[in-house]
Amino acid sequence: MRVYDAKVNHMTNPMGFFMDGVSFSWKVDEARGKAQKAARVRVAADEKMQEILFDSGMDEQADSLAYPVELALEPRTRYFWQVTVLSDAGEEADSEVQWFETSKMSEEWTGKWLTCDNTEKRHPIFSKEIAPAKEVAKARLYVTGLGLYEAYIDGKKVGDEYLTPYSNNYNRWVQYQTYDITDQIAGGGKLSILLGNGWYKGRFGFSAFEDKGYYGNEWKVIADVVLTYTDGTEEVIGTDESWTVTRSRIMFSNLYDGEQIDATAPELPAEEPTVCDAPKGRLEARRSLPVVAHEHIKPVELIHTPAGEQVFDMGQNFAGIFTFRVKEPAGTKIHIQTGEVLQKGDFYNENLRSAKSEYIYISDGNETVIRPHFTYYGY
């Protein structure tokens, strides 16, 4: 008998999610028996399951679809758990040890909400050098940015999610995400948070809101880096006036209209960030599941249309982004549009109405792999 697909609140090893309760679930196969007779759930403070915090004992009422357990959870804490299942044929099997890690919960933030000069259209990057004082046992980044954000350490993206912190009513609540950055920051490094417009800032909804943000018109960011050292002490580095603001080469981003990058744009002098008011919505641990790349699809055909266009046929309809390698002379403009059908053999996207659904890249002459950061396309 095998116990598998063990989840917490229907998620596998969730980190930093909002939890107003804890529920466990699991599946069983390869069993002689026809049904589960009982199950035992144990929760521990260690992966070896020796420091037991909760033990249900063999419970004949345990529901494998959702078994709620009352736990006094602590903020920023990883818990380990395991389920043992007894079948009606007398078989017994354990799941693999799983874990879940709590968010900041009600803990106060060290970081302050920061903004910058919002009249400059080039998308901002908020940065801070992180220099651990001792040997790092673990490191966590708690962060959100409005409208959208991507975090980097020494130029390498943190996590594999896109379009964070996702779409919700920002006037009511703003989600923050939690990342394990232990390996990336253990030796120190530069933490950078790139902001885009998204649903919060920029065109969203009906035409009355095209010239201003639906929820707000300021870029905003808040973050706490929590370094836990091997001696058990902690250091918290939050967003404050000591951070710096530089400008990316993203000139424009919008969920409807796409993104524009000018790699030839000159570097601008660093700016000082400004401490700003928090957004209207309460800052709360994430509820949205990660948006990640589930599949990489290659074009099945390059079509040369009667109008002289070059159209890549992806072979199916989907929502996503694209990546491509470019090496063109400096100043070369690459213009990509997306659509779902051809009309009379030519590219057609007038069904998108006013949405431009495009990507514009101006090359600086260097070979690079590029992708959109703060938009996605249906094509």
Give the residues covered by each predicted segment:
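Extracellular/oxidizing-compartment recognition motifs
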Residues: 1-78, 82-379
